Regions:
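Conserved small/polar residues in nucleotide/adenosyl-binding loops
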Residues: 199-205
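C-terminal, non-catalytic macromolecule-binding modules
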Residues: 127-130, 134-198
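Proteolytic maturation boundary segments
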Residues: 60-110, 159, 178, 182-184
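Extended, domain-scale alpha-helical bundle/helix-rich regions
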Residues: 2-86
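A general structural signal for short secondary-structure junctions and capping/turn motifs
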Residues: 8-11, 50-56, 63-66, 83, ...
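Flexible, glycine/threonine-enriched loop-and-boundary segments that flank and lead into catalytic domains
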Residues: 98-122, 126-128
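Structured core elements
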Residues: 16-18, 61-63, 98, 120-122, ...
Length: 209
């Protein structure tokens, strides 16, 4: 619910609500404000102080075929690029990682800058990789993506100066944490719910359970 208590439960900070109130101001007339403005206030506040993590909502396994077996290296990653005092953290990188299913397309359209067969992308804080092959199950669903990595691109930068346009989030297949993620979207189908007639909705009088 759009109450102060409800906003707090959804992670809104006091500063973001205050900034939102200052931005829209006070008026004597009824007004409709796009909820995206409130979300942007939260985004701007968290961007300054929230520690960063990487996660994949729909994980698909990537096997880096030319990476040494049974080797794990720990890469540096900034906790918050907007705040140097936040320090750094270590990310475990190995032969098997997970990326998000939506970051790969076998037959991509133009201007798709994420991973696809033969295309090179950057793994954030890690290396450049190129897709070589995909493995599918009996239903035709992709279960594994096989890639090559360039060991001279550690940290996400190449020695020869070549650039890639896609940068992917990833997590280690050896050291990851399962999480429950609740994705909230719009609760109403209309920008102004008060203008919608709900007379077609009826309350049932007999219910069998």
């Amino acid at each position: 619910m759009p109450t102060i208590s409800g906003l707090r439960r959804r992670g809104y900070t006091p500063e973001s609500i205050k900034n939102f109130s200052d931005e829209i101001g006070v008026t004597k007339r009824d007004a409709i404000v796009d909820v995206a403005k409130l979300e942007n206030s939260l985004r701007e506040d968290l961007n300054k102080k929230a520690p960063r993590v990487m996660g994949v909502l729909e994980p698909i396994k990537v096997i880096i075929t030319n990476y040494p077996d049974n080797e794990i290296e720990y890469l540096d990653a900034k906790n918050n690029p907007e705040d140097e005092s936040a320090g750094k953290r270590k990310l475990a990188f190995s032969k098997q990682i997970f990326i998000d299913k939506n970051d790969f397309m076998e037959d991509p359209p133009k201007k798709f800058f994420r991973l696809s067969p033969g295309k090179e992308v950057r793994l954030k804080f890690a290396y450049y990789i190129v897709c070589e092959n995909v493995i599918k199950n009996d239903s035709g669903e992709i279960t594994e993506i096989h890639c090559n990595y360039d060991p001279n691109t550690k940290g996400g930068m190449s020695e020869d100066g070549r650039k890639v346009r896609g940068t992917l989030h990833w997590v280690s297949a050896q050291e990851f944490i399962e999480a429950e993620v609740r994705l909230y979207d719009r609760l109403f189908i209309s920008d102004n719910p008060e203008t919608v007639s709900y007379t077609h909705l009826t309350l049932p009088t007999r219910i069998f359970v």
